[in-house]
Amino acid sequence: MKIVDTHCHTGIHKYEPVESLLYHMDTCDVNQAVLIQHAGETDNAYHVQCMERFPGRFAAAMIVAPEDDGRQIRCWAERGVVGIRLPANSRAQCADPLAQWRTAAELNLIVSAPCTPSALLGEAFTEVINLFPDLHICIEHLGGVGLEPQAPYEAFRAVLALAERENLSIKLPGFGEFCPLPYPFSDVAPLADMAIEAFRPNRVMWGSDYPPVSSREGYAHSLEFPMQYFSKLSEEDRAWIFGRSAQTVWQLT
């Protein structure tokens, strides 16, 4: 089974250089990864360099300035960046508030969307998914659910209803994002199970959240625990969750 990590941060001004990520990937037999630009950084050149230095191992999602009307998006796309990070309620600070969403749709980019449940259920995101039904949007961090939800998980269930939109997928993070430490987790809410039931395995993709995951369960455990937790699933379903979904969406071969 090929394993793809769909949520990694790396850089030279914040976090760690790519060699640190590659060490963890190689140690854990992770084949490929998606470099998600970190908040506040609009120079995506380092990610382009990473893709050029290690061909076939990485895809990347850019961030552009709030006032960009699409021109910078086009420039980075021409350099091989296949995705863009746009918060679910994002609006550009230019003549066309939807310019960045519109450009992403025109270029067939993948949107990696940081979010909260309220943002996903709000009017701004609803407008986007209605206007751009063919734009693939990958919901980050299990919908931003965090450690807060309590049964019966009404807000999270409302988020999962978005699975009826075929252009949406969802990232499954390390369980330390929604399970109390320490590791191994003993109190596991059924959120991951619910997400897989709603989106089906072919629209769920694992992402470690490296390097912030290092302050939770750590990189290796962020993969080890869900792999063990979902051992009851078929080999095909697990292949989708831990690699094939990401390869399909992020154009990794």
Residue positions per predicted region:
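Conserved protein kinase catalytic core
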Residues: 11-13, 146-147, 177, 215
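Active-site metal-binding loops of divalent metal-dependent hydrolases
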Residues: 8, 38, 142, 208-210
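Catalytic pocket-lining loop regions of alpha/beta-barrel enzymes
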Residues: 91-205
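Glycine- and other small-residue-rich loops at beta-strand/loop junctions that grip anionic moieties
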Residues: 36, 113-114, 215
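Short beta-strand segments
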Residues: 5, 34-37, 62-63, 171-174, ...
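Mid-to-C-terminal alpha-helical segments outside catalytic/metal-binding sites
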Residues: 1-9, 15-32, 194, 198-205, ...
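Mid-domain alpha/beta scaffold segments of enzyme catalytic cores
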Residues: 1-99, 103-107, 119, 162, ...
